[in-house]
């Protein structure tokens, strides 16, 4: 999809984290935005800065509201499944409800939206699905086992769906950012990541999304070179990390994310 002008884009998780950066970059490409999130006031504020964007309030932890969102959005050319929860902490500290909520928001909603919007894309012979995963969808880390599960699942779904849709005119891209500074769930903790992980900016992530769509890239890791190389050999890196004691998500960050589960 070389030209995004006048394409209709559904962006979930629009008002928070890197959402506004994604929306702004896409708006600059001339797309028509459909913004979704839980906070109506924040959605309305964002939409007014990106005319003629419209917004739909939806809680993606609700199975019913996910389906309602797909219907209300209307024909969509590009789906960007960006909504996510931190889901940090030891597994034994999670309630069943918290696990379900993380799975619904981070994984199930993206799969269901793709399922419901894909027939229209196929009938038009064009479209794109972008799944915002994480470098933690390739490299497991202690204290984020539930989050890892959702991102590993999202990445696997996206890569497999891309194979299913080969030569259909509809592309699928998985975006794997490392820790994002200045915006998003990591930046909100105020904790510095391990130097091996590195950091990127929201604008770098937004640029990767646009590039993935235009070039029909199956997967892009948005991370410093060393982190990208490490992600290609997770078993070796995991062994090295255990030796130097760098296997766990920073406990201080976990403590600040628990309330958002």
Regions found by a protein language model. Give the residues of each.
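Substrate-binding pocket helix/loop in short-chain dehydrogenase/reductase
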Residues: 90-91, 98-103
């Amino acid at each position: 999809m070389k030209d995004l002008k006048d394409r209709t884009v559904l962006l979930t998780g629009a008002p928070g984290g890197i959402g506004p950066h994604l929306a702004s970059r896409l708006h600059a490409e001339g797309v028509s935005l459909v913004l979704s999130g839980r906070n109506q006031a924040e959605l309305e504020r964002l939409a007014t800065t990106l005319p003629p964007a419209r917004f739909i309030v939806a809680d993606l932890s609700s199975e019913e509201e996910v389906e309602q969102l797909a219907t209300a959005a209307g024909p969509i050319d590009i789906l960007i499944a960006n909504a996510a929860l931190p889901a940090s902490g030891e597994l034994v500290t999670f309630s069943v409800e918290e696990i379900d909520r993380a799975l619904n928001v981070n994984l199930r909603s993206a799969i269901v939206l793709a399922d419901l919007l894909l027939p229209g894309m196929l009938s038009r012979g064009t479209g794109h699905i972008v799944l915002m995963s994480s470098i933690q969808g390739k490299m497991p880390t202690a204290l984020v086992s539930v989050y890892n599960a959702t991102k590993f699942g999202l990445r696997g779904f996206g890569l497999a769906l891309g194979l299913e849709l080969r030569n259909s005119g509809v592309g699928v891209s998985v975006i794997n950012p490392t820790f994002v500074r200045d915006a998003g769930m990591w930046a909100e903790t105020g904790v510095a990541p391990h130097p091996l992980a590195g950091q990127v900016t929201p604008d770098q992530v937004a640029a990767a999304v646009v590039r993935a769509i235009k070039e029909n890239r199956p997967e892009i890791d948005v991370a410093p070179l060393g982190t990208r190389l490490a992600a290609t050999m997770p078993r070796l890196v995991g062994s090295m990390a255990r030796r130097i004691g760098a296997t766990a998500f920073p406990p201080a960050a976990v403590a600040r994310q628990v309330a958002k589960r």
